Regions:
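Short, well-ordered beta-strand elements
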Residues: 1-9, 31-34, 52
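Detector for C-terminal structural segments
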Residues: 8-22, 38-163
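Short, well-structured beta-strand/strand-turn elements
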Residues: 25-40
């Protein structure tokens, strides 16, 4: 049976795993869904590469060089969390990653990223299934809470409570 792993605490990943299981069963493929605590998931998927499929939330942040490049660049094939655990390699994509990293012209960089996206969607080292919309909420008692693209991991160092 094909194994699909997901980390507890992210129920949307579990629901997606069950949908995948049902859809693959319909075409004769047996799937076992395995839910793991987050540390065990990271060990099994990223450190040990002991998985067939894994549901993993990827975020791109304000600059894709920071989060997308490590997930797909050949030089990031490592047994470590949140890098290229798929073992994906494409020399043309690597060249684009290397070039866009040093490109200062935003228009040229954007064109390079469109090209990278086209390659990744053709090669499918990871299959985007859904997007989790960011929801940010804070009590009106607080001021200067950063609500940016990174959501809950944004800095709160300047936040304060009005009394």
């Amino acid at each position: 049976a094909l194994r699909i792993h997901w980390a507890s605490g992210r129920d949307y990943e579990g629901r997606a795993a069950e949908i995948i299981k049902d859809n693959l069963r319909a075409v004769g493929i047996d799937v076992t869904v395995l839910v793991l605590d987050r540390p065990s998931f990271i060990d099994k998927v990223f450190r040990n590469w002991d998985f067939d499929l894994a549901n993993q939330l990827f975020t791109t942040g304000p600059d894709p060089s920071i989060s997308v490049t490590p997930r797909y660049h050949t030089n990031q094939i490592k047994k470590a969390p949140f890098v290229n655990g798929m073992g994906y390699t494409n020399p043309e994509v690597d060249k684009l990653f290397d070039a866009e990293f040093t490109e200062v012209d935003r228009t040229k960089r954007a064109a390079m990223w469109r090209n990278i996206q086209q390659h990744l969607m053709a090669d499918l080292p990871a299959l985007p299934l859904f997007e989790v919309p960011p929801i940010h909420a804070a009590s009106a008692k607080y001021r200067d809470i950063v609500m940016g693209s990174q959501g809950y991991i944004e800095s709160r160092e300047n936040a304060y409570m009005v009394r």
